[in-house]
Amino acid sequence: GGPADRARVGKTPGATAAVNLYAVVGQRKRGGSAAEAKPLLGLADLPGFGYAKLSKDTKAAVEEAAERYLGRRRELALGILLVDARRTPSADDRAVLAALYDMDVPIVVGATKVDKLSVNELGPALETVREGLGLPDGQPLCVSSVTGEGTKDLWRIILDAAETRVEELAEKAQGLTASKTAEDG
């Protein structure tokens, strides 16, 4: 998509106070128009606020909006927490991670801005993030929008989680149908 399809990215981290929703569209039929392609999955980009210079009232409102949004999303297939690899994880980062754990969904943490770190700085920075958030080995995933590092891996994780969730929901629906049929029989 073009510029109108993207969220505005500012120089101030966490300044966005809106939930941005995206429909990731599957492949269109051969010779079909983009309008004929069916949504594959939905992505919700929740506002960040860890390092923003927001007023306490604004920060509280952003937190409340994010909590309300997440609280209604029982079909969530994956939680992704993006943190700046150059910073020690904040209490806000830990709170978001805890909220995702409470929702009992798979979680991946992406360490962003890795392109701004030297080879010598990267290892210690990732260890700081890992320890600060209590992450298992293999996380965080290095991600850079500048170099593209980790973006294909992140998309694979997203698509795998969506596919798994669809299979779970299909099995649940079959189970409900089978029990309804047994009750009616």
Predicted feature locations:
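Conserved nucleotide-binding/hydrolysis micro-motifs of P-loop NTPases
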Residues: 15, 48-50, 86-89, 113-118, ...
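Short, solvent-exposed loop/turn segments at secondary-structure boundaries
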Residues: 54-58, 119-122
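Amphipathic alpha-helical transducer elements in NTP-driven molecular machines
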Residues: 16, 59-63, 90, 94, ...
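Conserved C-terminal guanine-recognition region of P-loop GTPase G domains, centered on the G4
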Residues: 63-139
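Canonical P-loop GTPase G-domain recognition
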Residues: 116-173
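Conserved G1/Walker A P-loop phosphate-binding module
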Residues: 1-53, 57, 163-164, 168, ...
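Residue-level signal for inorganic ion chemistry
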Residues: 22, 112, 154
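Conserved NTP-handling cores and scaffolds of large molecular machines
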Residues: 3-4, 41, 70-73, 83, ...
